[in-house]
């Protein structure tokens, strides 16, 4: 019976944590997608055909660097959140062992 209680508690905790992480990740990505960089606006207004190949390469490189930076920020946020969850789980395990 105790295993079923632990499973249910763990399942609910995982659901809550997954929802929080997913919500934060979704809101961060949606916020970043809503803001456009000047390079994207330049491409939207002038079109890709009006730029020479060096400018196209430079714009693509900058966009790629921006996306990598965004992904790194999100990864760091999730890593921090999971670290806090692991700390809480370790504290609970220690408390249960001392009972």
UniProtKB/Swiss-Prot annotation:
Can you tell me where the transmembrane regions are? 10-30
Coarse class of the protein's main subcellular location? membrane
Q: Where in the cell is it found?
A: Cellular thylakoid membrane
Kindly give the membrane topology term recorded for this protein. Answer: Single-pass membrane protein
What taxonomic classification does the UniProt entry list for its organism?
Bacteria, Bacillati, Cyanobacteriota, Cyanophyceae, Synechococcales
Tell me which InterPro entries the record gives.
Answer: Ssl2009-like
Superkingdom of origin: Bacteria
Q: State the protein's name.
A: Thylakoid membrane protein ssl2009
User: Coiled-coil ranges per the record?
Assistant: 50-84
The family database entries (PANTHER family) matched by this protein are listed as:
LOW-DENSITY RECEPTOR-LIKE PROTEIN
- Asked if Coiled coil is a keyword of the record, the answer is yes
Keyword annotations: Coiled coil, Membrane, Thylakoid, Transmembrane, Transmembrane helix
